[in-house]
């Protein structure tokens, strides 16, 4: 069986992404499960021979100031996300995964969408329902709202958004048992 290739972006270069990716790569038992193709700053992570770097325009980017959201790291993240999508689209990778992003920096860098999922939808010219699925063992949930303060949840609810979340999870699962539940930010 051919090993899957996962393009893995190290996330916000001013954040904890590289540290989290390093912790993942430091678990040797996980590496035989997939071939990892890293997207990020080459100097940010120690790698072994079985982990490859994708040679993209940001591989040798100058250091970013830790913990500071700027247009520069926002643009860097958007460019890296686009690079990851292109790797899957052209068959160079089977999947794309990314470490945490900084939404403030993404907006400063030019993202005008609500979040990275809507950015992906626009980038891919996708016009269907778009949202998050959360999985915990056999429990799958779809969010009606996401990343909004609790005090703003009720004003962000609508029957069409609830229906969209139900349609999304129903389409994602083969034989879903859909249960409506209480408000959760």
Range-by-range predicted roles:
Residues 1-118, 156-185:
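Contiguous, glycine/small-aliphatic-enriched amphipathic segments in soluble metabolic enzymes
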Residues 114-151:
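Flexible loop/hinge segments that line or gate small-molecule binding clefts
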């Amino acid at each position: 069986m051919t090993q899957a290739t996962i393009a893995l972006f190290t996330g916000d270069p001013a954040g904890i992404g590289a540290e989290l990716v390093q912790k993942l790569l430091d678990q040797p038992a996980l590496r035989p499960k997939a071939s990892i193709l890293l997207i990020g700053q080459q100097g940010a992570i120690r790698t072994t021979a079985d982990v490859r770097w994708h040679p993209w325009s940001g591989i040798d980017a100058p250091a970013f100031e830790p913990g500071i959201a700027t247009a520069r790291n926002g643009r860097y993240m958007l460019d890296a996300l686009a690079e990851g999508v292109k790797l899957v689209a052209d068959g160079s990778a089977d999947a794309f995964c990314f470490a945490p992003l900084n939404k403030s920096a993404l907006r400063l860098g030019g993202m005008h969408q609500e979040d990275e999922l809507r950015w992906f939808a626009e980038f891919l010219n996708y016009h269907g329902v778009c949202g998050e699925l959360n999985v915990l063992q056999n429990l799958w949930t779809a969010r009606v709202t996401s990343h909004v303060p609790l005090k703003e949840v009720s004003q962000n609810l609508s029957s069409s958004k609830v229906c969209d979340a139900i349609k999304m999870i129903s389409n994602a699962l083969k034989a879903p048992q859909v249960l409506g539940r209480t408000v959760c930010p």
